[in-house]
Regions:
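Surface loops at the rim/top face of extracytoplasmic beta-rich domains
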Residues: 12-14, 18-24, 31-33
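Structural signature of WD-repeat beta-propellers
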Residues: 6, 13-14, 57, 64-65, ...
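Extracytoplasmic beta-rich repeat domains
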Residues: 1-6, 27-57, 79-95, 104, ...
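Short loop/turn segments that connect beta-strands within beta-propeller blades
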Residues: 22-26, 73-76, 111-115, 152-156, ...
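C-terminal closing repeat unit and adjoining cap/tail of repeat-based domains
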Residues: 114, 138, 143-187, 193
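Structural recognition of beta-strand segments within beta-rich domains
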Residues: 11, 62-66, 70-72
Length: 193
């Protein structure tokens, strides 16, 4: 989905590119590659970006499948940092950390001060994780068994979990101090932690 910030529309595309448009006119302001195709087969060349760009503090954070975590500077209109990683979801900025749920359901965290890897976790490997959100200072995501997991973003340690549904959790989002979970059967749950 497009993200609107300061009269600009930020969109990531199936071809692995980020584009920024003027909201009023639709005029393309700038674009850049999140990652480049590097394989020899169609499957290896799949670099789809289904995640929403995250726009914060003059920077745009993007991810794509079989690609990169990439940070673009909106003033310079170019990538200023990237890291090889595969993800279906938008990265999360929380408590000075940049966190990515990888496509294999492992987690990777980077310090926002140094952009060096802070911690990684394979505790949820191949559990078909949902997107992650920051909520009340914690990182929260769902899994294929209908659980939500609560993680301390500073060290990656699981501090809680709760069974929400018997179906896999597909999406988590927060609005107005509430946490919402959508499962594979399109059931919506409102959670207060």
């Amino acid at each position: 989905s497009p993200i609107i910030v300061d009269d600009k529309v930020y969109v990531s595309f199936d071809n692995g590119r980020l584009a920024v448009f003027e909201l009023d006119s639709g005029f393309l302001i700038w674009d850049g590659a999140i990652s480049y195709v590097s394989g020899t087969s169609e499957l290896e060349n799949l670099i789809d970006s289904d995640s929403n760009p995250l726009v914060e503090g003059g920077l745009v954070y993007t991810t794509n499948y079989q690609g990169k975590l990439n940070i673009f500077d909106t003033t310079q209109r170019r990538s200023i940092w990237s890291y090889d990683i595969s993800s279906f979801y938008s990265p999360v900025l929380i408590r000075g950390m940049l966190i990515v749920v990888e496509s294999n359901s492992s987690l990777k965290s980077f310090s926002m001060q140094t952009l060096e890897e802070s911690w990684s976790s394979q505790d949820y490997l191949n559990r078909n994780l949902s997107n992650a959100v920051g909520y009340k200072g914690n990182l929260i995501f769902g899994d294929l068994d209908g659980y939500i997991h609560i993680i301390d973003p500073l060290n990656g340690i699981t501090v809680g979990r709760k069974k929400i549904t018997k179906h896999p959790i597909k999406s988590i989002f927060s609005r107005s101090n509430n946490l919402y979970v959508v499962d594979e059967s399109f059931n919506l749950f409102s959670i207060n932690l």
